[in-house]
């Protein structure tokens, strides 16, 4: 018989609704929710007095293909970490990367040895941040980070109804055990929350998913599209992926080349670090998006003809006269630069790999964000503290990178 575990879900958004709902539907899981945003916990608690949380899975049960529709009751929703954290075996972060710091600081006083802390998604630099906030306590915990949310999902009615629109087949994560000795299998515990799908797979180490991250895709496309923009509003929203041109593809491919070079450099200096899972973006698309791609000639044609991206446009703001200007404060830059591109640049800097494409794109992005992160080709700007690059946490050598494992 599997050991009963207590799962704490951090957050109150789409991912939190689904994660808490799935966990609460399992007989051998006690489920709690911690949401520190405004009065969200109080609102949700009051809703639960009169209602259940309904979850629908549009894709249906993986085996039967029938749609699934079920209801659960959440008995513990709070904004008080002293009530939520003690006794929790697994703590799952479903909030965006910018909120990780505040949640880590909230749970830190109450965290116990052998707890599993899960970033879902963690995003690049999650591990550095956990060790920075939890200090020695982190060494007694299991740290896990997954590459994305397991589903496409949306809240239909806050606290009452959430829809799972798509379930991923596989989801890769990494695991740092440290000195922890949990009485349960951490990967099995998270799989228990998920159910049959997605199937969770484990990366070779925590560095591999950082260099294989997909959060490097948006900034170079934004840069290639808008670097020479004249500031005048345009008539319609341009397609993001399918509107790719050769210039944007050159920057995207160049950044991917630099990641592959960084993986090779780290593996050459530390042969025990297996980074064989770091693929060029072109090869990754051919592997993971193949059914959707009509023309596999190049990275440019792959994105232009990827039907999974049908209709996806650049983040834009509408002007008073119904035209459009680019939104440079959208998550494509606000999230994917400090918690993506800057982290991969940081690894390359430690490995001694030149990154002209990273440097050029980051230099433009930081202007749009009003930050100074990169100076020349080095991460030493005054706003380095707003990123999750290893240098921010005093990690500047290959030994320091590897010692975290």
Swiss-Prot record:
Keywords: NAD, Oxidoreductase. The keyword Oxidoreductase applies. It comes from the Eukaryota. It is an enzyme of class 1 (oxidoreductase). Its EC number is 1.5.1.-. The keyword Oxidoreductase applies. One of its GO terms (molecular function) is oxidoreductase activity. It holds the Pfam family Octopine_DH. Transmembrane segments: none annotated. Belongs to the lysopine/nopaline/octopine/opine/vitopine dehydrogenases family. This is Opine dehydrogenase. It comes from Haliotis discus hannai (Japanese abalone). The gene is tadh.
